[in-house]
Amino acid sequence: MNENKFFLHQIKRNGTTITKGIVVADTYDAALQGYHAYLGAYAYGHEAGTDFVSCEITDMSGAHLIEETWLAPAPEPEE
């Protein structure tokens, strides 16, 4: 059984920090999957094609693990 670890995440919109939090997961990969789902949902809440939404994950020692930036996706076309 793996022991849970804590990861810090910071979400930015167009370079400005808008939220910070802690992800609790047993592995880095699990934290990354959760963050992808969260960031994807968050990006849909911003203006498509103009807003850049990014997320940075570090471990509790402050070691940088990943940072990704997404252009907020365009809405799905209506049929």
Residue positions per predicted region:
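A short, exposed loop/beta-hairpin motif centered on an aromatic-Gly-Thr core
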Residues: 16-30
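Short aromatic-glycine-(Arg/Gly/Cys) micro-motifs in beta-strand/loop hairpins
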Residues: 1-19
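A general secondary-structure boundary signal
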Residues: 9, 22-26, 56
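Short, mixed-charge low-complexity intrinsically disordered segments
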Residues: 40-79
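Intrinsic-disorder/low-complexity peptide segments enriched for small residues
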Residues: 6-9, 30, 37, 63, ...
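Charged, amphipathic alpha-helical segments
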Residues: 26-45
